[in-house]
Design a protein with these regions (language model features):
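Extracellular/periplasmic loop regions
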Residues: 49-72, 285-286, 312-313, 323-435
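Outer-membrane beta-barrel "beta-signal"
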Residues: 61-63, 479-492
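Outer-membrane beta-barrel strand-turn architecture
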Residues: 87-89, 131-135, 174-178, 208, ...
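Residues on the lipid-exposed face of transmembrane beta-strands in outer-membrane beta-barrel proteins
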Residues: 97, 123-131, 167-172, 214-218, ...
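Structural signature of outer-membrane beta-barrel domains
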Residues: 102-106, 136-138, 142, 146-148, ...
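Surface-exposed loop and membrane-interface regions of Gram-negative outer-membrane beta-barrel proteins
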Residues: 105-123, 131-181, 197-201, 238, ...
Length: 492
């Protein structure tokens, strides 16, 4: 047997063991979820316990310290495990997890580069434990296992990670009676900043975005600030092989926030931020090489009566090899709520403009980098990121019946500059601007139905269709793309 064959057999054996481990865990979690759902005390728990957060380290079950453990529901037994039952209010462990299955069907994916129908099954398993040592010290850890079957020609790196550490950090908090509240987190962590368009956690794909580094947060009165510096975790398909020291992509930033209480306005927030981004290998239409980019931005959001707004604008500078970066992007979203109606409908009008490169022969590049924006920037087909696009969008959503939420979104897309091409998430150059002078990219339609069975189970159906415009039709692959996603998620 050759060394190559031996390694191949070893890899298959490890993969088999890991798959068996994950399947066992998945069935255990599903069974646990079903048991919790069937528990006769669930109605009480649903009414008195907090919802699960998108970032699970934000879940806080310290309030259970003031109740008798003998009165706990089966679910609460997992959420508060005191290390010393003789000392209520002392150190405790809280555990939880998630199982997510999603079937994705695509027709003529990537503008027809992959013709016909293609289906894939994705599975994601997350397990976490939160060790709370005191009011000021804790350690949070989370494992991830992500699998995909059926994707052709191959799975994306953000959809497969057989078993690895998603998060593992230590947190030091300020004293409970301190005037300024804050914390310092050091380790692998997910980062989300107050609704920013340029920093999301990549929830759509199987593997969420995480960073190796440090984050400091301070809040006092109407002001808060965040300072962070980290390298971006690059997911790999194997076992515990996501590097802790890979600095090929780094990200640092400072965000200053102000959230005053103003008469006639609710949920008002204003942010000023600066981000520093480095990528050792990136490709744009004009040039490929090492990128060092700074982003300076302002954001404002809030609500007045039935009206709601969320506006953000950014300037970018820096270098891409020998080229100077000069780019900008703005996004405006204005919503109107009909809260008195039984279905509580909401209508949102959006307009975003993101620059592309204006001149291939000069010493500048004007393509805006959307950094870590949502992968489904223009719908669930995830065909494009915002770079070099002008987007007019209309979104309507409502609760048809209790727990069933439906939304319909339309995006009309043009190129900002005819001298630049198009980019797929996260920033992959997919189409040259040379194929046509047309700005017309096309229309994207998305229908989303979300059924919240209870606090543990969510079922979602997403249908999307991209209708190709003149620029797409002029290319080597020139069709629209349709997609259907069926997603079931269990959390505990």
């Amino acid at each position: 047997m050759t060394n190559g064959e031996s390694r191949s057999n070893g890899e298959r054996a490890r993969e088999s063991v890991t798959r068996g481990f994950c399947r066992g865990w998945s069935w255990l979690q599903v069974a646990a979820s079903m048991a919790l759902i069937a528990s006769p005390s669930r109605a009480v728990a649903d009414a008195t316990t907090p919802p699960f957060h998108l970032l699970r380290y934000d879940d806080n079950y310290s309030y259970l310290a003031h109740r008798q453990t003998s009165d706990f529901t089966p679910w609460e037994d997992l959420k508060y495990i005191p290390l010393d039952r003789e000392s209520p209010g002392g150190p405790f462990v809280s555990v939880g997890g998630e199982v997510r299955f999603q079937y994705i069907e695509r027709w003529n994916d990537q503008f027809g580069r992959i013709p016909g129908a293609q289906g894939s099954l994705q599975q994601r398993y997350l397990w976490h434990a939160d060790l709370v040592g005191s009011d000021q010290v804790r350690i949070f850890g989370q494992l991830i296992s992500a699998w995909e079957q059926g994707r052709k020609p191959t799975s994306l790196p953000t959809d497969v990670d057989h078993l690895d550490v998603q998060q593992l950090f230590a947190e030091l908090k300020s004293a409970p009676d301190a005037a300024a509240k804050g914390y310092l987190r050091i380790g692998r962590q997910e980062i989300l900043l107050a609704g920013h368009q340029l920093l999301k956690i990549r929830e759509g794909p199987d593997v969420r975005l995480s960073f190796n580094g440090a984050r400091a947060h301070v809040a006092q009165g109407d002001f808060d600030s965040d300072l962070f510096a980290a390298n971006v975790v690059q997911p790999r398909a194997g076992l515990f092989d996501d590097s802790w020291t890979d600095h090929s992509v780094t990200f640092a930033g400072l965000n200053l926030g102000w959230h005053p209480k103003l008469s006639g306005l609710a949920n008002v927030r204003a942010d000023a931020f600066v981000f520093d981004y480095r990528n050792r290998s990136v490709r744009y239409e004009q040039f490929a090489g090492t990128e060092h980019r700074q982003t300076y931005g302002l954001r404002a959001s809030g609500r007045s009566g039935s009206w709601e707004f969320d506006y953000e604008g950014s300037l970018q500078s820096g270098t891409l090899g020998p080229l100077a970066i000069r780019a900008w992007g703005v996004a405006f979203f204005t919503s109107y709520h009909w809260d008195s109606e039984p279905t509580k409908p909401k209508l949102t009008l959006g307009l975003s403009s993101v620059t592309g490169d204006r001149n291939r022969s000069d010493r500048e590049i004007n393509t805006f980098n959307c950094l870590f924006a949502r992968g489904d920037y223009f719908g669930d087909t995830s065909l494009l990121t915002g770079s070099n696009t002008l987007d007019l969008s209309l979104l309507t959503d409502r609760e048809l019946v209790q727990r069933l939420h439906v939304s319909i979104q339309w995006d009309r897309l043009w190129r900002s500059e005819t001298t630049d091409g198009l980019y797929a998430p996260p920033l992959i150059y997919v189409r040259s601007g040379l194929v046509s002078d047309s700005r017309d990219i096309g229309n994207q339609f998305t229908l989303t139905a979300t059924l919240s069975v209870n606090r543990f189970v969510t079922v979602q159906l997403i249908g999307s269709a991209f209708v190709a415009g003149d620029f797409i039709k002029a290319g080597p692959t020139k069709t629209g793309t349709e997609g259907l996603t069926m997603r079931t998620q269990f959390k505990f």
